[in-house]
């Protein structure tokens, strides 16, 4: 598959590897693709680096067998802080015990050494594509909430479906009508006609909804 370098450049990677040669070579290569690559030489340093930069680190690539703190133990500690950050394990092992432990830690992928760089980049590409979609959805939800706040603070708002069943009312409408949203959502618009709402207000609402 093609690698979206522009997309990868929006993200920051934590790379943990105890082999000096592999760490230097791969980190230099990955720096061409990511916005930033934080590098650590063992699990203890990797954990410290994550704690110091957790607000900007988007995903983790880590070796399994390392001195001081191995990859499994490091990720266990990271998972107590962030249970969603995507993780890829690089390992020379593919035994069932490791896989079971990785599943418990919600590891997205694992890659067997020696690392196939193109395959690794394709894994990264899939992960950041999902992260970016989640970001866009979150951004849309936040913008919608801001829009609702603006609308709610300045206008009386009532929405209906094509059958004139009430689907949404804002706080200002509730204050004026004397109902709460739970009492109104799902009711037919004409429900208001038989309550205490003034007939001229109901008529204006009805006409405006039909015209819009």
Feature names for model-found ranges:
Residues 6, 11, 19-39:
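Two-component/phosphorelay signaling modules centered on CheY-like receiver
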Residues 42-45, 70-76, 188:
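Acidic catalytic/metal-coordinating carboxylates
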Residues 66:
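Receiver (REC) domain active-site loop signature in two-component systems and cognate sites
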Residues 73, 94-109:
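Alpha4 helix (beta4-alpha4-beta5 surface) of REC/receiver domains from two-component response regulators
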Residues 157, 164-167:
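Conserved hydrophobic beta-strand signature of PAS-family and PAS-like sensory domains
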Residues 173-184:
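PAS/PAS-like sensory domain cap-loop motif
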Residues 185-197:
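PAS-family sensory/regulatory domains
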